[in-house]
From Swiss-Prot:
Protein keywords: Membrane, Mitochondrion, Protein transport, Repeat, Transmembrane, Transmembrane helix, Transport
Gene expressing this chain: VPS73
A Pfam family recorded for this sequence: Sugar_tr
Record organism: Saccharomyces cerevisiae (strain ATCC 204508 / S288c)
GO cellular component: fungal-type vacuole membrane; membrane; mitochondrial membrane; mitochondrion
Membrane-spanning parts: 27-47, 91-111, 120-140, 147-167, 179-199, 209-229, 306-326, 343-363, 367-387, 397-417, 433-453, 455-475
Protein name: Vacuolar protein sorting-associated protein 73
Cellular compartments annotated: Mitochondrion membrane
Membrane topology: Multi-pass membrane protein
Length: 486
């Protein structure tokens, strides 16, 4: 899914630091890499069922070794079924319940991280990911797949909120945006990694090993976290001044006195009423600082309207139909190379994300978002026509273009604009609301697409094109330019 993340707002600040006040140390690089592996886990789970879903669900049988029965393989000898019978609706449910877990995880993530710390919360989520991944790998039933997908969804939904908090808090002044962009890039890398592993393993004998890959990543991430220091800002916010200084010394490579000076600056920030870490909002439905109060506040109507349309609309343009079901879509016209083509589409996604991360800070929001949305509408329409008329080459070319033009604007900008149209005191609740909208939109597409596509075929992309066209009109009339000059 693509976008789900309130953390994408960090892309708005991507720029090279004006001065090398703080160098990037090996310890800091290691901490950023370890944290970013959580984003890779998110991308991996988001698309892990894309390539193998046909052989997983007994819809197709691809036997890699003729004359060698499955019962004689390592998996077959240990009682793992060759496939799990699933219809289109069940495939949609197994894919989409990841989003249910994601909503739960992202909703409570900030509270978890503020109480237990960024490091310990990440360890909890890695543990949950390990358990969920093992359940998915070992599952011989529809129910087992659902349970595992919900668990990894909770883990990934939480990680995708905690990771940007950690990176923002450990990054030296001037580097926050550049390092923060790692979240989005690593999500795309996770998707690419899944498709790369799927190239040799998508057949009726070995598809489970694709699912096992997420277990290995989670285990690696879990043990790597033990060498990472806790966020010094979180430590200071909890009164652990000495620990904060030591953490800052290790991460930044500064002396104890230099760390003490920066800690003193942070303490002055706290005393001035400016929160050092992202505040926790009330988790109750009807509390004084709750999401329900935000939804009822009439002063937020215009900004909330913009957030709702952009964050739902981002998903209803259909991009996750490619991320979640791209192999099945392309295989209808080009079955021999569908997985390979999907891999290269994911590679384009990574490259465009890196380019956008470097340039987006210098471009105005509204024209870029308009351009991206209009091009998404045009390319989705052409993809629909190509599918309906069996134009294989046209479908492949415009699948690449569709992914590229979405990534250049409609992917990151709704999250950036979400922050910029909100009042400062409502920003945390606005992010939470927007993230929920995005998760719900992803759930709807993940669940309904295989069912609707089975009935409408290419016409489903024409529907996406009409929705994207409508969103373009909304952006033109209702969305303000939020980028400040300078």
């Amino acid at each position: 899914m693509n976008r789900i993340l309130s953390s994408a707002s960090l892309l708005s600040n991507v720029s090279m630091p004006r001065q090398n006040k703080h160098k990037i140390t090996k310890a800091l690089c290691y901490a950023i890499i370890v944290a970013s592996i959580g984003s890779i886990q998110f991308g991996y789970h988001l698309s892990e069922l894309n390539a193998p879903q046909q052989v997983l669900s007994c819809s197709e049988f691809d036997i890699p070794m003729e004359g060698y029965p499955y019962d004689r393989t390592w998996l077959g000898k240990r009682g793992y079924k060759q496939c799990i019978p699933l219809n289109d609706e069940q495939i949609g449910i197994v894919t989409s319940v990841f989003c249910i877990g994601g909503i739960l995880g992202s909703y409570f993530a900030t509270s978890l991280a503020n109480i237990y710390g960024r490091k310990f919360s990440s360890l909890i989520n890695c543990t949950l990911n390990i358990v969920g991944s093992l359940i998915i790998f070992n599952s011989n039933s529809y129910r087992g797949l659902i349970i595992g997908r919900i668990l990894v969804g909770i883990s990934c939904g939480s990680l995708i909120v905690i990771i940007p908090l950690f990176i923002k808090e450990v990054a030296p002044s001037g580097w926050e945006g550049l390092l923060g962009s790692m979240t989005q890039i690593c999500i795309r890398l996770g998707v690419l990694l899944t498709q790369g592993i799927a190239l040799p393993l998508t057949d009726s004998y070995r598809w489970r090993w694709i699912l096992f890959g997420s277990f290995l990543i989670a285990v690696l991430n879990f043990f790597m976290w033990f060498i990472v220091d806790e966020s010094p800002k979180w430590l200071l916010a909890h009164g652990r001044v000495t620990d904060a200084k030591l953490s800052l010394c290790k991460l930044r490579g500064v002396t104890f006195d230099e760390a003490a000076q920066e800690i003193q600056d942070w303490q002055l920030q706290i005393e001035s009423g400016d929160p050092l870490i992202e505040p926790t909002t009330t988790n109750s439905i009807s509390g004084s600082n709750s999401l329900w109060k935000y939804l009822r506040d009439r002063t937020n109507v215009k900004s909330r309207h913009v957030i709702t349309v952009l964050l739902f609309g981002q998903q209803f343009c259909g991009i996750n139909s490619i991320v979640l079901y791209g192999t099945k879509i392309i295989s209808q016209l080009y079955p021999q190379h569908a997985i390979r083509i999907n891999f290269f589409i994911s590679m384009v996604n990574v490259l465009v994300t890196i380019l956008v991360s470097l340039l987006i800070h210098s471009l105005p929001r509204k024209p870029l978002l308009m351009t991206s949305t209009v091009l998404v509408s045009v390319t989705a329409f052409i993809m629909g026509i190509a599918m309906n008329h069996n134009k294989m080459n046209l479908l492949i070319v415009f699948s690449f273009i569709y992914m590229g033009v979405f990534t250049m604007g409609l992917n990151p900008l709704p999250f950036i604009i979400m922050r910029e149209v909100s009042k400062p005191q409502d920003m945390v609740l606005a992010q939470r609301y927007g993230t929920i909208c995005n998760w719900v939109g992803t759930f709807i597409i993940a669940y309904t697409f295989p069912i609707i596509h089975d009935v409408l075929s290419g016409y489903v992309f024409i529907i996406f094109a009409i929705i994207a066209c409508s969103i373009s009109a909304f952006i033109w009339k209702k969305v303000p330019e939020t980028k400040r000059s300078g």
